[in-house]
Amino acid sequence: MKEGLAKTTPPGVGGDRIEACSYPESESLFFKRTLGRDDLEPIHDDRAENYIVSYSLVSKRREVEQILDRIHHLKCENEPVKWPGRSAVVRTQIDEILSNMAKPDCRSFRWNQHYQSALAQLKAEMMQAHLKPLCLSAVAETETFRKNLKKNAGFMAFETGKRSKGENLDEALRLAEASESEDVMRRHFCKPLVVAIRTSNSGISDWQAGTWKERTRPILMVDLRQLLQSSRFGVPFNDWFQSHVSWGEGGMTHQQVEQWTWKARTRFRHWLSTDFSKYDSSQSSWLIEDAFSVVKAAFPGLNTHEEGLFETIVNSYIHKEIHSYNGIWRVNKGTTSGEIWTYTINTIIHRLIEVTIFSMMGIKRYESLLCGDDGLTYYDGELDLAKYGSLITRYFGIAVSMGKSTYGSAR
C-alpha cells in the first residue's frame, strides 16, 4: 500500500481485494519501465457498491472519472452496453476471477530441463509457419475481424458512446495508427479492460433433455484499438495454428473430432481429460510470456519496430488494468476472455504443461486434442493420476480437480 493509506476492508469484501487494487511501491518498476513514469495517486470511487481504494495514472484521472460517470449513467438508463451489478451470482464470479488474478505468480519453473525441452519442442513446431504480421488496414478486412463487428468495442465504447466495433472501426484505425509509435516506446497500450457479462445457451445435453439452459458468465472486453494491433499477429497465427497444429482442436468439425477419437482409441490403452480449476486466471506471467515466445517463433525476420510491437502486445496482455463494478483492479497475470489470443495462449499453455509433466513421469507415447483448458489425451504406460494433478499444481500454480477429471481404459 502507498504510505498514508490504511488497509481497511470494505463491508462484505475480502481483505485481499484492497491489495489487488492498490499498487505497492516495491512493484512500481513496471510503470517506470513500460510507461516511463511512476506518478500514481489514489482515486476514490464512492459510486462503487463496495467502497474501495483504487489507483490510476494521474494523467488519466480525469478520463477515468468521466468514464465512471458514463458507466453509472448507462447502468441507470439501461443502455445496450451491459454492466454487471444486478446479479449477486455474477458479482461473485467477477470477484473470484479478479481476486485470483491478483494473487502472486507461482515460482518460475523455467529452470527444469523437462520444461525447457517442452518449450523448445513447441517453438520448433511453430518455426515451420514463416508468418508475417499484417498491417492495420489489412486486419480490418479479414473475415476473422469482419464477422465480429457487431460485438462491443470495449473501453472505446464508453469513450465514444457507440457500442459496436463496426461503429468505432474507422476512428479506432486512425487512433491506433497515430499512437503506435508512442505505444511501442512505452511497451504498453494503456487501454483498460472492462468487465461485462455474456449470456449463452448450453449445448447438446440440454437439447437432448428438451430444455435450453442459459449460462451467464463474466468476460473482459479488450479495447478495440488494442485488439486491432494484437490482430496484426493474432489473425495470421490463429489461421495457421488451427489448420496445421495436430494437437489443437480449433477449426475441426465434429466429424473430424470423432474420427480422431476413433483412431486414437485403437492405438492407445488409456485416456484422460483433465479438469482445471480457475485455469485462465491462474496462469503466471512467466508462463504466458513463454507461450507468446512460442507464437513469436512463427514470425521470423521481424524488424526492430515489429519486435517492439510484439513485446507491447505481450506486455499489455499480461499487465492489465481492469474496470469492474467495484473499482479499478491492476493485475499482472492471467488470461482474459474476449481477446484474440485467448484460445491460442490457453491451448499452448495446456500443451506446455502436458508435455512437461508427461516427460517427468516417463509417459513417452501419447496423442492429444486440446482446446484451451479442455482436452482429451490418449496414452500408453502407467500414470499416477493423483501425482499428475499435484505436479501441475505445484509447478504451474494451476489447480487440478482429479475428482472432476475423467479417465479410463480405451480398450
Which residues fall in each region the model found?
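Viral RNA-dependent RNA polymerase
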Residues: 1-411
